[in-house]
């Protein structure tokens, strides 16, 4: 598995950022494996359907015992193992009163299934982008609330900087940044990113 020690920004620095959503829409073998994984978790056969989400992961919905669950799957070629970190972060912010979905299962080890996954609480609401385009969002109210949440989660303090260390989390249950200083993280891929912008050319001399 790959950690994120060489990553500054995921979509820029990941070797194959869109593997999971490119050419995977009709992968019957993968669909069957995901069905088996979800059914194993619930202890009985469960119907699983595509959620058609937008982003870097494959998404599914599963119904069990009168509830709908949201499934995220990461099967990229670089073996990213960050879903457990994401689950831990959600748990941490939820513990200080910030609304966050509950994670019922997470595993990015790929020891039993050939993908990382989360089984989480489903939020049965419209996509925010769709609501925004339809003029149905009170932006001033929402931005005020989001600002309050951001201020609150600043109460959480961790050692290190940059992406969290997944091995540290697995072995010791601690969230710790992969880099010792902010400078080390900030300049990690600066030269590569600037070179890319010059070649496009987005930046000129």
What are these regions (language model features)?
Residues 2-46:
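Juxta-kinase regulatory segment immediately upstream of eukaryotic protein kinase catalytic domains
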Residues 165-205:
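Active-site catalytic-loop/activation-segment of kinase and kinase-like phosphoryl-transfer enzymes
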Residues 4-11, 140-144, 184-188, 192, ...:
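Helix-rich C-terminal or lid/interface subdomains of diverse kinases
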Residues 21-28, 32, 77-80, 133-140, ...:
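Charge-dense, low-complexity intrinsically disordered segments
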Residues 47-49, 205:
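Short, P/G- and charge-enriched loop/turn segments at secondary-structure junctions
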Residues 37, 152, 192, 196:
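Solvent-exposed, charged/polar functional surfaces in cytosolic regulatory/catalytic domains
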């Amino acid at each position: 598995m790959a950690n994120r020690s060489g990553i500054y920004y995921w979509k820029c620095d990941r070797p194959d950022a869109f593997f999971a959503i490119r050419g995977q829409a009709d992968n019957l073998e993968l669909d069957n494996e995901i069905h088996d994984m979800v059914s194993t978790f619930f202890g009985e056969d469960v119907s699983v359907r595509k959620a058609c989400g937008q982003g870097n992961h494959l998404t599914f919905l599963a119904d069990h015992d009168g509830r709908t669950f949201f499934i995220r799957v990461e099967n990229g070629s670089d073996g990213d193992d960050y879903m457990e970190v994401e689950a831990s972060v959600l748990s941490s912010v939820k513990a200080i009163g910030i609304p966050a979905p509950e994670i019922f299962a997470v595993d990015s080890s790929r020891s039993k299934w050939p993908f990382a996954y989360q089984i989480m609480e489903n939020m049965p609401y419209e996509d925010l982008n769709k609501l925004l385009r339809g003029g149905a969002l009170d932006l001033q109210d929402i931005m005020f609330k989001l600002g309050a949440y951001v201020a609150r989660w600043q109460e959480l303090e961790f050692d290190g900087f940059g992406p969290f260390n997944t091995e540290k989390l697995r072995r010791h249950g601690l969230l710790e940044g992969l880099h010792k200083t902010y400078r080390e993280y900030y300049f990690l891929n600066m030269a590569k990113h600037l070179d890319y912008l010059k070649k496009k050319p987005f930046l000129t001399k």
